[in-house]
From Swiss-Prot:
Enzyme Commission (EC) number: 4.1.99.22
Similarity comment text for this entry: Belongs to the radical SAM superfamily. MoaA family.
Gene that this polypeptide is encoded by: moaA2
GO molecular function: 4 iron, 4 sulfur cluster binding; cyclic pyranopterin monophosphate synthase activity; GTP 3',8'-cyclase activity; GTP binding; metal ion binding; S-adenosyl-L-methionine binding
Function summary: Catalyzes the cyclization of GTP to (8S)-3',8-cyclo-7,8-dihydroguanosine 5'-triphosphate.
Protein name: GTP 3',8-cyclase 2
Pathway: Cofactor biosynthesis; molybdopterin biosynthesis
One Pfam family here: Fer4_12
Amino acid sequence: MSDSRLVDPFGRRITYLRLSVTDRCDFRCTYCMSEDMQFLPRDQVLSLEELYAVADAFIGLGVRRIRITGGEPLVRKGITGLLARLGQRAELEDLAITTNGSQLRERAAELKAAGVRRLNVSLDSLQRERFAAFTRSDRLEQVLDGIQAAREAGFERIKLNCVVQKGRNDDEILDLVEYALANQLDISFIEEMPLGSITSHRRELTLCTSDEVRAIIERRWPLTPSLARSGGPSRYYQIGDEPSRIGFISPHSNNFCGDCNRVRVTAEGKLVLCLGHEGALDLRELLRSHPGDRERLSAALVAALNLKPERHHFDAQEQVQVLRFMSMTGG
C-alpha cells in the first residue's frame, strides 16, 4: 500500500506526477497544437526553481514517479540541471521523460547521467513525407538517430508513443511494431484525445480504437497479456518471448479512470486533476506569493485532491470538451 497523503474522494492514491516544464516545442504536431500556436510569455512559465519546488512538495506527499513533459521538455534551457536534482531524490522510484526525440542524438547520454530511467518518444510514422505532415517538421532521420543514441545510452526502457488515425497512418501499424521489435523497444498505440480545437482533421472520422489496432496486429502476431505495469494507463501485451511490450491507451473505448493514480502540473503552474476536465488550481500564484513555503504548498495540494473527478467523459462524436491543447497540458 502506498503511503501517499494525496487521496481523492474515490479512494485513489496519487503516486504519479506528470510535470510539464515548457509549452514550447520545435514540432507542431497536428493533434497536439494548431499551426499558429502562440506560446506563453516566459514570465508566465514556472522557473526551474519553482518546478523543483512543486516536485519536492509532491515527493514529500508520497509521489514516487515523475514524468517530465512539455511541449518538448528538451528545448527548456537548464532542464538537465533540474533532472539531475530530481535524479538524486532517493524517494523516487522512477524518473522519466516524454520527448519528440529531436534532441536525443546529442543529449541522450547526459539525460541518462542525470538520472532519467525511461524515455517515451513520440513516433507516428516511419515515412518521411507523412512524418513531416504529422509534425510539420521534416526531421524523421534525426528522431530515428536519437532513438538509436538513447538505446546506446542504456536507459531501462524506451517506449514509442503512436497516435493512430484512420486514413493517415493506420496502414503503418505493423511497420511500427516491426521497428519496435527489431530495436527492442516498447510501443503504445494511443487513441487521439479531444483536447484543443484543430482544423487539420476531423477527430470523429479519424479515431482508430485500440480494439481495431489490436485486431490488425493479431493478424500477424498473437498477443499475450503482460503482467507488466508502467504506472500509466497502458494495457500491455507481448509477442512470444520478445522483450518488447505492445501497449494500448484507450481513453475512448476502454475508460481507464478507475485506476487513476496521477495528476498533471502545466508549465504555467496549473494543477490539472483530470485530463478530461477544464478545471485547474493555480499553483504559480501560491509559489510566487509564498516562495519557499513548502508546508503551504503541500496543504494546497492535499486539499485540491478533494476536487478530483471520478472520470472523464471523452466522446469522439461531440464537440471539443477541453479547449486546452495537449502541448499546454503536458503529454
